[in-house]
């Protein structure tokens, strides 16, 4: 008895999720599209129900990206432009398309999709302000969240179970000291002592246990970007529980940085600076990037600072042919 528009929405959400899954599998198990225009092997494309003895073969990266684009574009027609927390909507798919096109070096389309999200969403999404920045990270469906996986402690698994992004929170008082911030990242952040993102790195609370790695002793090496629904990044690390922190997959700040990179690559310095400085100046209102300072390296640096702990840096450097 479902209404046709409801069936269309559910199908579109499934297509969007399939596109997201295939994209993530391809970038993880395949070479970057930009290496050889997708000629190398990616992952099998499986879009039909098969018998258990089916032996899938790998498709090329280009074929995988073609299917990703088809799924995402086919999804758009059945999705709402209204905010739909914990579900894919029109804007989250457009944001994902900006990411996919950027990975393909299709910068015209990457910029087009990113700008549509930024300029046409009707105010249902907006960047955090400088003052809001320290207090938003545990909240459900904040103003930048285009799509996130929802977790609650009432689930049998106990929220996220501490897996995924919340595990980036890793204080050695709980014996999770295998995930720490690198010196390279801390050096980037320390270039500006007034950067609001200094709220994320924390010193170990247990001085006795602060022994490994030796080179990082006494450094603020733990990332508390996921403090849980009742926590704050300014709380003591040992007092917060990240297990019920939602996992944000698509965030508006990334879309701005996608737009900045795409605009730079097609030679539109004005737009590149506009979108980049929205992030730079938010982090420190006294700072901005000038045309003389604008470069791909500067944009990637800002991506690394802003999107730390969100799973982007490795792929950003790989797709741009940079050393990791």
Model-based region annotation:
Residues 1-165, 176, 187-324:
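Acidic/polar-rich alpha-helix caps and helix-coil junctions
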Residues 168-185:
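Short, cationic low-complexity segments
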């Amino acid at each position: 008895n479902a209404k046709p528009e409801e069936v269309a929405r559910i199908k579109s959400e499934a297509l969007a999720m399939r596109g997201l899954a295939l994209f993530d599998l391809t970038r993880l198990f395949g070479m970057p599209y930009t290496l050889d225009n997708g000629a190398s092997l990616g992952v099998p494309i499986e879009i039909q129900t098969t018998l258990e003895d089916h032996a899938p073969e790998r498709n090329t990266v280009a074929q995988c990206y073609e299917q990703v684009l088809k799924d995402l574009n086919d999804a758009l027609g059945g999705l709402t432009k209204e905010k739909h927390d914990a579900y894919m909507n029109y804007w989250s798919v457009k944001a994902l398309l900006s990411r996919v096109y950027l990975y393909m070096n299709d910068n015209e389309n990457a910029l087009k999709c990113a700008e549509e999200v930024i300029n046409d969403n009707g105010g249902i999404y907006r960047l955090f302000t400088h003052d809001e920045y320290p207090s938003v990270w545990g909240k459900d469906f904040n103003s930048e969240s285009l799509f996130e996986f929802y977790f609650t402690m009432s689930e049998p698994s106990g929220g996220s179970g501490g897996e995924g992004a919340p595990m980036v929170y890793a204080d050695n008082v709980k014996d999770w000291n295998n995930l720490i911030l690198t010196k390279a990242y801390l050096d980037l952040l320390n270039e500006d002592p007034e950067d609001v993102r200094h709220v994320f790195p924390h010193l170990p609370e247990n001085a006795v246990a602060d022994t490994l790695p030796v080179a990082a002793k006494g450094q603020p090496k733990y990332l508390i970007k996921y403090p849980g629904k009742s926590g704050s990044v300014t709380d003591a690390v040992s007092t917060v529980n990240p297990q019920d922190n939602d996992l944000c997959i698509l965030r508006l700040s990334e879309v701005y940085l996608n737009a900045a990179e795409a605009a730079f690559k097609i030679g539109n310095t004005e737009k590149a600076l506009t979108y980049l400085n929205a992030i730079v100046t938010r982090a420190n209102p006294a700072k901005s990037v000038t045309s003389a300072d604008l470069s791909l390296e500067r944009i990637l640096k800002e991506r690394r600072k802003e999107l730390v702990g969100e799973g982007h840096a490795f792929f950003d450097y790989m797709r741009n042919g940079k050393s990791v």
